[in-house]
């Protein structure tokens, strides 16, 4: 697993440690990862059992509570117990322009959260993120207003440093929502999906944007997406509202 710590306000991550424990060993081993001059947010770990690697990845910004600028990742060799790759990829202005929703291009990725990490046999990987946010009484929240990352629950949270394990529940009412246990009406939004592919050396190969615009009041149960990995292609399934009816797309 990973252990993350940050600024005094706990709104950014600037230190990450990988914690591993070998079978039949009593003590865990802690390795600090290199994080220099950037602030991380929404950090995840994925285990590559085929290549015996750990992939740790996160969005990052250059300033505390600043705009998301790109992707940070570290590749760790399980057998050698050492770092193989540590790098960042900065999103181009063209990609930000393509990804923007209600935000401008500079803040295009501020509402995106990691949903899936897909590992390839050649050591490359793909990252799937979705623009999700919520608002209450006309006040739209940004990523720094959520205590532990995305305002929605996601199965990817199993790999996250802020895993909901421990009785927190699956809905945002039980963990991340700042309106927990009061009577405010909350509107949830789930918008574009960004898919980014990287090679084994961490170089960005291609990106794609799936357009959608979803919202619901006091529940996120019918918005968001499901993904089917068919090997040679990814299929995305989600609801779209037409004449007050949800149509599966």
Model-derived regions: residue spans:
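Beta-propeller blade signature
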Residues: 13-26, 68-82, 145-167, 174-203, ...
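Short, solvent-exposed beta-strand-terminating loops
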Residues: 82-87, 129-155
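Surface-exposed loop and turn segments in beta-propeller and other repeat-based domains
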Residues: 30-39, 81-108, 205-219
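Solenoidal tandem-repeat scaffolds enriched in leucines and small polar residues
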Residues: 1-38, 43-58
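Extended, charge-rich low-complexity regions and/or helical-solenoid scaffolds
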Residues: 204-249
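Short glycine/acidic-enriched loop and turn motifs that connect beta-strands
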Residues: 5-10, 61-65, 133-135, 241-245
């Amino acid at each position: 697993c990973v252990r993350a710590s940050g600024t005094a306000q706990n709104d950014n991550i600037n230190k990450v440690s990988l914690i591993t424990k070998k079978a039949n060993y009593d003590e865990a081993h802690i390795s600090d990862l290199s994080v220099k001059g950037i602030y991380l947010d929404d950090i995840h770990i994925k285990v590559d059992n085929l290549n015996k690697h750990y992939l740790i990845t996160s969005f990052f910004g250059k300033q505390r509570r600043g705009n998301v600028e790109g992707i940070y990742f570290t590749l760790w060799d399980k057998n050698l117990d050492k770092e193989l790759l540590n790098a960042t990829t900065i999103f181009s202005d063209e990609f930000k322009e393509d990804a923007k929703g209600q935000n401008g291009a500079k803040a295009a990725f501020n509402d995106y959260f990691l949903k899936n990490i897909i590992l390839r046999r050649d050591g490359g990987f793909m990252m799937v993120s979705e623009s999700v946010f919520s608002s209450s009484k006309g006040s739209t929240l940004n990523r720094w207003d959520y205590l532990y990352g995305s305002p929605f629950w996601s199965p990817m949270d199993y790999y996250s440093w802020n895993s909901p394990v421990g009785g927190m529940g699956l809905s945002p009412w039980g963990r991340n929502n700042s309106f927990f246990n009061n009577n405010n009406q909350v509107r949830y939004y789930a918008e574009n999906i960004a898919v980014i592919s990287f090679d084994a050396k961490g170089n960005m190969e291609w990106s794609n944007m799936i357009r959608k615009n979803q919202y619901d009041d006091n529940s996120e149960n019918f918005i968001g997406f499901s993904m089917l990995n068919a090997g040679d292609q990814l299929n995305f399934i989600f609801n779209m509202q037409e004449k007050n009816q949800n149509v599966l797309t």
